[in-house]
């Protein structure tokens, strides 16, 4: 049927059940219910692969959304610590917070514009290729360049060509566009340095590598 089938009793009038035909001819039931809390994703949030997500730094308003993801691990890509609210959120919900880009001493492979190094990228990828860390969120301050670097290196590991990797990276950089140094780092990163345990790797990665 194409009309509203049924409303709940008056005491449940905040719930509406709709039974309608969609273009394919198959019935679809949609149940609308106002959430108890605002559900707001973090800045630049996007699924990357199954149970793998990316975003900017989450704040208090994003925590109800993150709870729905049932995160086990958050990779934080920055030299500075995240906000206290995020630290407390991870502690309260038993989420492992991994600092993948803390590099106070620097080094010859230091990436001066954002603190990322070959070593920190590799550490992040070692976590990402282990399904025991999932569901997993990769994030940095704005979810643009640092996160884009790690995800770009992951895409190369998956066999993507550089044009596709660059297109995805630039999709999150906003009106200022991408940084050529980021794209050069992604291109130069040694993907053979990332060890993959196939018994623990996510299925989508195994499919990409097959």
Swiss-Prot record:
Xref: InterPro entries: PFA-DSPs (IPR020428), Prot-tyrosine_phosphatase-like (IPR029021), Siw14-like (IPR004861), TYR_PHOSPHATASE_DUAL_dom (IPR020422)
Documented EC number(s): 3.1.3.48
Enzyme class: hydrolase
Keywords, comma-separated and alphabetical: Cytoplasm, Hydrolase, Protein phosphatase, Stress response
Catalytic activity: O-phospho-L-tyrosyl-[protein] + H2O = L-tyrosyl-[protein] + phosphate
Ranges where the Tyrosine-protein phosphatase domain occurs: 44-204
Localization per record: Cytoplasm
Gene3D superfamilies: Protein tyrosine phosphatase superfamily (3.90.190.10)
GO cellular component, one term: cytoplasm
Active site (record annotation): 140 (phosphocysteine intermediate)
Highest taxon in the source lineage: Eukaryota
Short name of one Pfam family: Y_phosphatase2
Single GO molecular function: protein tyrosine phosphatase activity
Function noted in UniProt: Putative tyrosine-protein phosphatase required for protection against superoxide stress.
Record family assignment: Belongs to the protein-tyrosine phosphatase family.
UniProt-recorded name of the protein: Putative tyrosine-protein phosphatase OCA1
């Amino acid at each position: 049927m194409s009309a509203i089938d049924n409303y709940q009793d008056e005491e449940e009038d905040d719930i509406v059940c709709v039974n309608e035909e969609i273009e394919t001819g198959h019935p679809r039931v949609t149940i609308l219910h106002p959430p108890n809390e605002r559900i707001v994703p973090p800045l630049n949030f996007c699924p990357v692969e199954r149970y793998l997500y990316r975003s900017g730094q989450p704040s208090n308003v994003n925590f109800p959304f993150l709870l729905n993801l049932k995160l086990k691990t958050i990779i934080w890509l920055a030299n500075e610590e995240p906000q206290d609210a995020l630290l407390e959120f991870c502690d309260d919900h038993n989420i492992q917070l991994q600092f993948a880009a803390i590099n106070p001493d620097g080094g010859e492979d230091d990436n001066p514009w954002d603190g990322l190094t070959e070593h920190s990228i590799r550490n992040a990828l070692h976590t990402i290729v282990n399904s025991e860390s999932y569901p997993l969120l990769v994030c940095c301050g704005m979810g643009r360049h640092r996160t884009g670097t790690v995800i770009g290196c992951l895409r190369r590991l998956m066999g993507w060509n550089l044009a596709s990797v660059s297109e995805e990276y630039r999709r999150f950089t906003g009106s200022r566009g991408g940084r050529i140094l980021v794209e050069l780092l992604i291109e130069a990163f040694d993907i053979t340095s990332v060890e993959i345990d196939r018994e623990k790797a996510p299925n989508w990665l195994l499919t990409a590598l097959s």
